[in-house]
Every structure is written in C-alpha cells, then in structure tokens.
Amino acid sequence: MRNKILIVGLLFGMGVAIALDQRQRFEAPAMRWLYPGFLERLPSVTGLRLSKAGDGVDLVFDNGTWVVAQRFNYPVNDKPLFQLLDQLDRARLIEKKTALSKHHGALGLLEDASDSGSVLMFQGDTLLKPVVIGQQASTRPGTFVRFQSDDQVWLIDQALEVSAAAADWLAPSLLTINDQMIESIELSNPGEVKYRVVRDERDNWVLAATPEGRTLRYDTALTPLATTVGQLRLLDIALHDPARWVGAGSAVYQLTSSHRLTLRTAAAQEGYWLRIVVDSDEVDPSDASDATLQVKAVEPKRSPALDQVLGPSREALTRFDFRIAKRNFDDLNRSLEHFLKPQDGEEIDG
C-alpha cells in the first residue's frame, strides 16, 4: 500500500512537469531518458541497493513499508527516497562524454576504489540496469553517470546526491511535540540535583522549588527544556543494550494528554544515546529499573494523540536504542545550576 502511495505521490507531484516534458518533445529535439518508462516500472521494484567503496545499503519494500535492511528493517526516511525516485524519473541523457575507462576516475565513476562512484542497483526489475553515479558537473546542473556494464559516460540533467551509508537513510523523526503539549518536566541526572519544571499563572516555565536565595538567569531560561524535545533527531540505531543504561540520566515529560514520556540518555564511546519510554502514572521513572520501564513500554495506552507524538513505532521503542547528536544530549542533561543566576562572586557560565 505504501508503495502505491509513493507512486501516486510521484504522479501528482510531477504531473505538471510530465505534461510540459511531453509537450516539449514536439517542440525540441528528443533526448534519451536515463530510464525510459521509469514510473511505470516502479511498481515492480522490490528494493534498491546503493554501494560505494565497500560500504552499502539495501532499501527494501517489505510488507508495505520501505525499510533499511542493514538497520534491522527500520523505516526509511521517505523524503530522500522520494527525491531520488523523482530525479531518476526525470533524468535525461543530455550529453555524451568519454567512453575511455581511463577517464572514469576523474569523473568519480570508478568502482571499488576510495574515490569511487555510488552504484545504484534495482531489485525486482531486470530492465532497470545498474548505474554508476559520479561527480556533479561544475558548469551546469547535472551528474556524470554510466551504466555499470558500459564504459560510456553520460551527463544527465539531474544533480544526484546519494549515500551508501545505512544510517543516512533512517527515518529521523523521534518525537513530534510542542510546548503546549507539555504539562511538566522533571530532570534527574547522576551527580546533579533533581529538579522539576512547571507552568506559572502566566504560562511561563518556572521551577517547582527554587533554591533559597536564588533566581533564574532570566524569565524564559527554562523554555529550551520544552522546545528541545521536539527537535530531537535520530542519527543511528542499535539493538537495546541494558548495560548501556546503567546510571543513565532521565528527563520525564508529563503531557497534557495524561501520557508520560521518560527520555533516558547515556554517553558512550560510540556516541550519545536516547531511550524513549511511555509509562503509566503508577511507576516513578526515577526509581524504576530499565527492565520495569521496558515492560511498561510494550503495551502503553493506545491513543491517537500519543501516536501523533511518537516517530518510531511502539515495537521500535522497546527494541532499539537511538543515537542522537551531542547538542541534544547536552540539552537533556542541563544541571539546575545552568538555569540559575550566579551568586555574588561566581563567574557567569554562558
């Protein structure tokens, strides 16, 4: 079904352009298509493989969903996939270049070399021949390509940018949430004072308990705690490892929908990690073990409101740990002192 939706989207999105292209065939000399009839052949495609210098990724159409095979069949980021398919459908061979293989390196069209091009292969339709994607042209929009079985180089009229790294194709959304959906926030990090943030009568974020003699740096100092959660972006995934979460910090977001999200964060040698748990109000996330939270996450309350908030599926939340950017990690681990105005004699920490 999703494959059909993707095709319908391509048809509607390119309808005007296709009509213009067809009219131009009668007004200008015809140019060859990179893949004639590509859109009509798309329903038979069951997967794409992109490889470069020993690295490679398989995007597979599995049970109605495009997934990344090298990442445990995690959903694909539709945006770059849609763009790539759109460009391949539009691509024309506008200029014939060299047919001498000795010049392939200069155009980024070698295979199995450190400066090689990306090889794109289709699964499910043998008429869509593998193509090597090289450098982009410097004088006009376009990309040098050649079919894998042919030394002849062509310039096409599309600027193709593709990646053979599996992590680059993962659906990046983690949480779709805004300030007004949050009722309160509680941060608890190792070695730091636990604190809770709530709204005051003017709807500003304030500390539930301000340390005696201290004030916030400025009135809206706590606002980033509410906005950060909607700006989280997934960089990669790994199978859930309980050992990764020993001593991890947590940020608990109580939502106006009565759901509660516990965002656990951990720093490791390979990067910064996030674990998202949907738990019930009976469990105190700061006291519960990861095993307890994981059980609660298997069957959280089902609600359209919660489904709109969560990027990953419920199963993915239980199965995976999510790698995030350092800035996201830092934002979810701000100490209480970070938000307070320095005391007399203290230097201001920007």
Where on the chain are the PLM-derived regions?
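A short-motif feature that recognizes glycine-rich, charge-decorated loops
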Residues: 1-350
